[in-house]
Structures are given as C-alpha cells and as structure tokens.
Amino acid sequence: MSPLQIYYWDVHNNFGDLINPWLWPKLMPEIDMEPLPKKEDGIVDAGDKDVLVGIGTLLNARFPKGRKLYVMGSGVGYGERPPLGDNTKIYCVRGPLSAKALDLPESYAAIDAGVLVNRFLPEAPSVKYKFS
C-alpha cells in the first residue's frame, strides 16, 4: 500500500502549516506517511493515493484530489467551499464556522489540530523562584 499523503500549504513559512509532516507521523506512527505539499499554482492531485488534510485553512476550492481524503482539524477559508465527494471522510474541522460552512453538525467542530503538538513538547520545568 502506498503511503498516506499529508496535504498542507508550504508556499509561505507558516508554523501551523509546516508542522504537518512532522506531527502526523508522530501521532499515527503505524501509518506510513509522506508530504504532499500544496503549491500556489493550483490543485494538487494525489492520483490513486489516500490523503490526510490536516492543519491549516485547507478546505477551499483548491482541495486536493485523491482516492480517499481524510479531514482532521482543517479550517474553511480563502474562497469557495471545497468540492467534497463520497471519497471524503471528515472526522472534525477547526471550529463552528468551518462546520457551518460545510453544513456539518456542530459536533464536528473541534479545534485547530495544531494543538496536538503539545503532546510532543517537553514539560516546562517547575518554577522555584519568582525570577529564575
């Protein structure tokens, strides 16, 4: 089976977008993944591969094409609503406005998936003094 393609915007250096290829393989290490960057010149076509649409405002008219598309925490914006077909499985979107834009029940509105990066950050050291 071919690797799951991680779809994200990589035209401008934006932390939220650029953590996609770092974060998703850590969250789901049992799944073989590789980057499928979004380019400024148009729609990305993953062909017969499955695509994970994750962190960022990626739900728009430039939505990728692929065999099966999995949406986890993405937001709607930057133009027209995406063309969602039967091959799209939405687990959650970034918030209530994204859910409403896609005519989804409010229960699909979660939070920006970027908050998951916190699972892999070291714990902050305890503070012993007021200024340390």
Which stretches of residues belong to each language-model region?
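Aromatic- and Gly/Pro-rich donor/ligand-binding loops
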Residues: 1-132
